[in-house]
Each structure stands twice: as structure tokens, then as C-alpha cells.
From Swiss-Prot:
Homooctamer. It comes from Alnus glutinosa (European alder). This is Thiamine thiazole synthase, chloroplastic. Substrate binds at S98, E117, Q118, G125, A190, D221, H236, M288, R298, M299, G300. Pfam families: Thi4. Disulfide bonds: none annotated. Belongs to the THI4 family. This protein may be expected to contain an N-terminal transit peptide but none has been predicted. InterPro entries: FAD/NAD-bd_sf (IPR036188), Sti35 (IPR027495), Thi4_fam (IPR002922). Binds 1 Fe cation per subunit. The modification 2,3-didehydroalanine (Cys) is found at C219.
Length: 352
């Protein structure tokens, strides 16, 4: 049977008539040169690509493009993403420090993950530390997650400090968005939930700017994303904060959202991880939104609980999907399961 060592990837039918190079610009063919050798010596073969032309910055010119091509390339890809993720495995609402750490989900290539973020710039409050300062404090043992990401820090006895919070956020974001089974829909808000038979089955979406201007127009209906599991990581109260648990309260699936209590770092971070859970069938709550629903203290500018809460939420989602996870011991990988195994009684409320 004949076989080939290389094969050209098949193009999607959608791109058959496109003149763009979806699979990348082909490299210039290499030239192979056989050097003459003396008798008995092995031939010497050298390979070199076509030389790159020198840049003339006084007469720099880009390759030409038709304006409509730019529009079509953006539109086609975004529309294909909307079609692909209209019915997905997991929707993560909120791409802050806890939501981004749900990148644990993306390690399983069979899990399709859509991330919805109302802001143009994902990251939530994790671009800075407290009071607009740049350093990010992470209490041990959450520094083990930073080791996994390869993020450098200044180590102290009980905590570590990243020189700039943006280093953490940009690193995890780049790792997450590079995965083929993840799509970030930023500038998109989750206005409501899909609920069927007492189970959350997705989210109702709209452009964030539309959500902010419903009172100025007569009718701007939303769109939907169905999902097997919804992870709500919308943060503490605010214009788009704690929207997941607020929606549950408005439709009667939970009774109250008492809001977070006064700051106590030592109580707060442990409580956030412990109380991260599937709050109603089909919906997991993580990060500071946990404090809103359970009346836990706020933690202030420490970020370890955000990271470990996000890890725990990811493995709760994997468990809900019937996939290997650290919670039941079926997961095989580099995670530190001791960080996320803290169980939570669904009726437990954190004390300030």
C-alpha cells in the first residue's frame, strides 16, 4: 500500500472560493545545493531559503489589499464562531481573574468553551493590584498555579508578589485564547439565563453597548447560547457584576443575594474556594460572585482565591460533563488537586 509522508490540509468548503490564505502564506521554496566532495567523502548538502529583501524604511510599502476583503475576513470568522458556539459544552460568563482560570477546562480538547465578557478588554480587576497599584499579591499555596504558567514572582514567607498584575492576566489570556477549543466573545453581555425543567441550559446574550442602551431604543432583542454547563464568574456587585446570581433571584431559583460583607482577607479567601459550587443544576458560581450569594467577606487585593476558585469551578464543570476531573480522582495531569478539593455544603454560609 502506498503512503505519503505529508499531506495538504483540506480546506473548509466555506473558504473554497476565498482568495485569502487561511492556512498561512506558503514559504518560498528552499534551494538545495550539493557541495562537490573529494573521493570517499560524504556529500555535503546545504539548504537555504530565498533571501529576505532588506527593509527600506524611507519607502516602506505593505502588500496591497482590497478594503472589502478586510470586512469579509472579520465577518466570516466571527459568524462562523457564533454558529459553532451557539450550542456548546461550557459557557463562562465573565473573563476576570477567576473566569480566565477556567482555562483548566480547555486542557481537554474535546470540551468546547465559550467565554463571554462585557468589556472590550478581558481581565476584570486583574490588570492592577489594590488602589490602582501594579503589584499582585498571591497567598501560598496558590503560587503553584503561577509556577504552572511560568510566571516569575518575588517570594516571601507566606505569599508571593508578581511585579505587575498585568503579567499574570496577559500570560493566562494568551495561553487560553491560543487553544483551538476556546472562543472569547468580548463586548458581549449575558442579559439572562436559559432555564428548562429547573436546569440552567445557557445564556441570553447581547452586545454590551446594546444592553446599556435598552432604555434609549424601542426594541433590541437578544441572542442565545445553549450550553451543558454555565460558569458564572461575574464578580461582585456593579453594573455588570453578580449578574448570574441576580438572574437566579429574579426568576425565583434562589431566594436572596445578601451581598458580600466587610473585608477580612484570611476568612474571605478560604471561604471563596470552599463555597465555589454548582449553585443550581447547570450553573456553577465562582470568584467574588460567590461572596455575593453567600454573604462572605470581601478579600481586597489578594488574588490566590480567585485562581483556585476558578480551577475548582473548571473541575466542577468537567465533573458535570462526566469527564475526568480532580474532584473524584479521575483526572490525570499536572494540577495540584489538594488546592481545589475543599467541599462545600450547599446550605453553608460564610461568617464574617
Amino acid at each position: 500500500m502506498a503512503s505519503t509522508l505529508t499531506s495538504k490540509p483540506q480546506r473548509l468548503a466555506l473558504f473554497e472560493n476565498s482568495a485569502s490564505s487561511f492556512y498561512g502564506t506558503p514559504l518560498a521554496p528552499s534551494s538545495i545545493r550539493v557541495q562537490p566532495t573529494k573521493a570517499g567523502a560524504k556529500p555535503s548538502i546545504s539548504m537555504s531559503g530565498a533571501p529576505s529583501p532588506p527593509y527600506d524604511l524611507k519607502a516602506f510599502t505593505f502588500d496591497p489589499i482590497k478594503e472589502s476583503i478586510v470586512s469579509r475576513e472579520m465577518t466570516r470568522r466571527y459568524m462562523m464562531d457564533m454558529i459553532t458556539y451557539a450550542d456548546t459544552d461550557v459557557v463562562v460568563v465573565g473573563a476576570g481573574s477567576s473566569g480566565l482560570v477556567c482555562y483548566e477546562l480547555s486542557k481537554n480538547p474535546s470540551v468546547q468553551v465559550a467565554i463571554i465578557e462585557q468589556s472590550v478588554s478581558p481581565g476584570g480587576g486583574a490588570w492592577l493590584g489594590g488602589q490602582l497599584f501594579s503589584g499582585m499579591v498571591v497567598r501560598k499555596p496558590a503560587h503553584l498555579f503561577l509556577d504552572e504558567l511560568g510566571i516569575e514572582y518575588d517570594e516571601q514567607d507566606n505569599y508571593v508578589v508578581i511585579k505587575h498584575a498585568a503579567l499574570f492576566t496577559s500570560t493566562i489570556m494568551s495561553k487560553l485564547l491560543a487553544r483551538p477549543n476556546v472562543k472569547l466573545f468580548n463586548a458581549v453581555a449575558a442579559e439572562d439565563l436559559i432555564v428548562k425543567g429547573g436546569r440552567v441550559g445557557g445564556v441570553v446574550t447581547n452586545w454590551a453597548l446594546v444592553s446599556m442602551n435598552h432604555d434609549t431604543q424601542s426594541c433590541m432583542d437578544p441572542n442565545v447560547m445553549e450550553a451543558k454547563v454555565v460558569v458564572s464568574s461575574c464578580g461582585h456587585d456593579g453594573p455588570f457584576g453578580a449578574t448570574g446570581v441576580k438572574s437566579l433571584r429574579s426568576i425565583g431559583m434562589i431566594d436572596t443575594v445578601p451581598g458580600m460583607k466587610a473585608l477580612d482577607m484570611n476568612v474571605a479567601e478560604d471561604a471563596i474556594v470552599r463555597l465555589t459550587r454548582e449553585i443550581v443544576p447547570g450553573m456553577i458560581v465562582t470568584g467574588m460572585e460567590v461572596a455575593e450569594i453567600d454573604g462572605a467577606p470581601r478579600m481586597g487585593p489578594t488574588f490566590g482565591a480567585m485562581m483556585i476558585s476558578g480551577q475548582k469551578a473548571a473541575h466542577l464543570a468537567l465533573k458535570a460533563l462526566g469527564l475526568p476531573n480532580a474532584l473524584d480522582g479521575s483526572y490525570v495531569g499536572g494540577i495540584h488537586p489538594e488546592l481545589i478539593l475543599a467541599a462545600a455544603d450547599s446550605a453553608e454560609i460564610a461568617d464574617a
